[in-house]
């Protein structure tokens, strides 16, 4: 099954119509050999400095620059985002191919890459 991940539900609906994914499921569309799902823009963000080290919890000139190795991402703490991410995570695990249908440009690419990374995409 091919999985398309769009950046927003309206784009996912348009893609689903084109590829024949006309069956609406919980958090995605399916049909024609495709599953089409969406993010709500940023589902993930970089972890806060304190998530890396207690020494970085409070700002201090002595702790600058803060450059964690490696940078880590986390889900944004919003229930609807967590729910949609769990749907995406399951779809990615079952997919043969994942197609990045995020918005064109650096930000759209980043949104999709972080979601795929957090979901442990192997495609």
Q: What is each residue range found by the language model?
A:
Residues 1-123:
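Intrinsically disordered, low-complexity regulatory segments
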């Amino acid at each position: 099954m091919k999985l398309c991940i769009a950046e927003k539900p309206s784009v996912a609906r348009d893609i689903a119509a084109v590829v024949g994914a006309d069956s609406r499921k919980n958090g995605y569309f399916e049909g024609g050999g495709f599953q089409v799902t969406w993010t709500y823009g940023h589902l993930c963000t970089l972890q806060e400095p304190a998530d890396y080290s207690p020494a970085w919890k409070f700002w201090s000139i002595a702790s600058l620059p803060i450059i964690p190795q490696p940078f880590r991402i986390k889900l944004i703490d919003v229930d609807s985002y967590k729910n949609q991410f769990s749907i995406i995570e399951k779809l990615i695990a079952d997919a043969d191919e994942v197609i990045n249908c995020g918005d064109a440009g650096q930000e759209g690419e980043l949104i999709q890459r972080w979601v795929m990374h957090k979901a442990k995409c192997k495609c």
